[in-house]
Amino acid sequence: MLLETGGAVLHARRYLEGCGHFLIHNVDVFSNADLKWLSDQVRPEAVATLMVSDRKSSRSFLFDPETMLLVGWKNNVTGEVILSEDTLTEDHCLAFPFSGIHLMSDRVFGLMDKYVEEKGLEVDPQAGVRFPIVDFYLWAMKKAPIYGALSNDLKMLDVGKLDSLKQAEDMLRSLNL
């Protein structure tokens, strides 16, 4: 059973609990992400720090412009908006697409347990539970601090498709590694 990112993180709990912070990186994202820089952006109170960039995307997370605290999400195609508070408006937020690269605190597991329980998700004793990380973040943003870290120099490519591999090869060459 594919658990999606949220379920996979929860399933790996026994390996990650007690480690402080850990990196989650979508396997089909090829990038020049500066992971040391991302680590330096982590605030002590954050349960997650999400690397975002200023680029075109069909979906964006919404952040408080002063703190980069996650306060919502927008589907840029349909116009659907989810906000953490009724008093917020989309025009008072910064919108940035998520890179699929994030650092989580091991304190996230207690929140994930509450999410699974509150949502009534089915848990397979062997395989675990399936849930998308974005859905979890949109629920958790009302309960714990999740911050965005805007990477101005981030270049990324979705290599989950065969036609992207040539672009990835060209990008790798341009990085002069």
Question: What function would you assign to each model-found segment?
Answer:
Residues 48-66:
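Short beta-strand-to-loop element that shapes/binds the nucleotide-sugar donor at the catalytic cleft/hinge
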